[in-house]
Amino acid sequence: MSTVDLTYWDLAASTSLVLIAVAISFFQGLGLERSLIWAACRTVIQLLSVGYVLRWIFQVEHPVAVLALVLLMVTVAGRAAVQRSDYTFPRAKLLAFLVLLTTGLSISYIVTKGIIGLERWYEPRYLIPLLGMILGNTLTGISLGLHSLLHALKRERDVVEMELSLGASAREAVAEPMRRAVKQAMVPIINSMMVVGLVSLPGMMTGQILAGNDPLMAVKYQILVMFMLAGTTALTGIGMSYVTYRKLFNNNHQLLSELITKQN
């Protein structure tokens, strides 16, 4: 089965679907017309730009080009993860970047080299899509976990400091907020795994089917992706909670609550 190629005229015709949303916003007085049009324009520009960049990277297959795109993706994901939280602390974006980079590349290596069995684990046709799915899902987990932990340290500051005064170490005093943070980070992927294939067909699976691949092969890859996302989300949740705790306590086991600030 061959894939039906969409022309630019087909894409232009698809804008009528966005215009339906614009019309509803106008007649219902929602005031979202400009936002919808701007969002549609950004969608076209961003995706076409990514498409041309990926086509070039797939053609040259040079490790430096792949690394540059990986660093860009992780940087954007790290910033987005921290910005989605109501609270932040100094160097939070840098720490999120490091956590996402180490866990993302580690899991990608395990999947591409150890499970799929690629000769070159950084094969861009595999690494870039897989890493993109990892970052897209784990940044949500980091954001939820970070918000939970920082909010708890602000709200439960007296409880934490009381435990410290009674002889608990910083790690012991923050153990429960960290557990809640990791649990919060895991909720979205667990919910997705519960309903996958029943309520919705994931993007990767749908894309492979539309591309003409065998549905069972698409399902196998999707199962691999879901398990990959579960493991990565757990690792990034624990990793971000740990580096946050290390940043907010000094060597004397004192909570530096003044470092936690509310974002605009």
Question: Language model features by range: what are they?
Answer:
Residues 4-17, 60-75:
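Structural signature of hydrophobic alpha-helical transmembrane segments
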Residues 10-14, 65, 87-145:
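Loop-to-helix entry region at the N-terminal start of transmembrane alpha-helices
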Residues 22-34, 77-88:
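C-terminal ends of transmembrane helices
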Residues 148-184:
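Short cytoplasmic-facing helical segments at TM-TM junctions of multi-pass membrane proteins
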Residues 173-201:
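Transmembrane alpha-helices
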Residues 191-216, 220, 236:
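Non-cytoplasmic
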Residues 216-245:
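Hydrophobic alpha-helical transmembrane segments of polytopic membrane proteins
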